[in-house]
Amino acid sequence: MKDLLRQENNEVADITIIGAGPIGLYAAFYAGLRTMKARVVDSLPQIGGQLTALYPKKAIYDVAGYPKIVAEALIANLAIQASQYHPEILTSTQITEIHRNGALFELFSEDGRQFLSKTVLIAAGVGAFAPRKLPMEEAVKWEGNGLFYFVQDPTVFFGKKVLIIGGGDSALDWAMALMANAEVTLIHRRDKFTAHEDSVEKVRKSPANIKTFYELKSIVGKDSPQGKELHKVVIFNNKTNEETTLEVDAILCNLGFSTNLGPIKNWGVEILNNAVKVDVNMATNVTGIYAAGDIVWHPAKLKLIATGFAEAAIAINNAKTIVEPHANFFPGHSSSSKEKK
C-alpha cells in the first residue's frame, strides 16, 4: 500500500475524492477506468478509513466474491486495484473549504494547501468518528487496561474471559470471532438485536453466554505485579434490578460511534439526517459535487460497503460527463475496455 501514496502536485484533477476508505479507493479505481485524473485526500494518517483505524482484523462477510475477508486485506486489495491507474493519494490532509472558481473547484486543507479540481466526490464515511463510551466515570481509568472500544489485535483477548457489550453487528461479529479462543459473555440492554439476523442466530447457537436486558453497573479491579488490573464486573437486569457478578479479564464495548460531519456542513451541500443528500445520480445540490458511501442519504440508502461501491461507480460515471461533456455516461463493461488496451 505504501507504493500507492504520492506527494501532491499542482495539476488540476478531473476528480478529487474526499475519503480514502473502501468507497474512496474503489472510486479512484473506477475513475481510472474512465481515464480520469483522480486525487484522493483523507484526514487520517493511513488509507482505509474506519476499517483500518478501528477494526483492521475484523472479518467482513457481505462483500461480493468474498465469503469472508479481513478488513485490512480488503483495503490492501482495493489499494492494489486502484494503484494500476496511479491516483494521487494524500493522507493526513483534511479538506476544510470548497469553493467554486469558474469551471473549477478550489479545495483548501487545514494546513493552508490549495487543490484544484473539475469535480468532487465526497466519500468520507460517517465523517469524523469516535466510539460511544460507557456512561460511567470509573470507566475512563480502565481504557486500554482491560477496557476496549475497538479491536486492533484480537490476540489480546485470547485465553481470557471477555465481556462484550452491545447488540449490533460489531458486537456479534466479535463474539463469533473470539469465542474459539476466549470465554465470551455478551450482554445487551434489550432482547432485540440490530445485527444481521444470521449473526444473531449463529451467536445464539454458539457457546457464548448471552444475557439480554443486562447492563454494566460497575468494574472491579485487583492488584497485580503490573499494577491494577480488571478482575470482575457487576451487571444488572434492567427489568428486575437483579445484580450478577462476573469474573472477566477484558471488556469490549461495541456501543456504536458518535459521528460529526465537521467542515462538510459548510461546503454548500444539502444535509439531511446528518448525511449529504444526493439524487439518483449521486449528485448533491451543488453541480459537480457528488457523494457516495455511508456519508450519503437517499430514500433507498443501505449503509453497506457493497452498495457504496455501486454508488461510487454511479457518481464517477456522472462526473465523467462534466469533465468531458461528450463522453458516454455508460462506458461499457470493464472486461471490454481492458481488452481494447
From Swiss-Prot:
Keywords: FAD, Flavoprotein, NADP, Oxidoreductase. Binds 1 FAD per subunit. The keyword DNA repair does not apply. Pfam families: Pyr_redox_2 (PF07992). Its EC number is 1.18.1.2. Its cofactor is FAD. The keyword Oxidoreductase applies. Homodimer. Belongs to the ferredoxin--NADP reductase type 2 family. This is Ferredoxin--NADP reductase 2. It comes from Chloroherpeton thalassium (strain ATCC 35110 / GB-78).
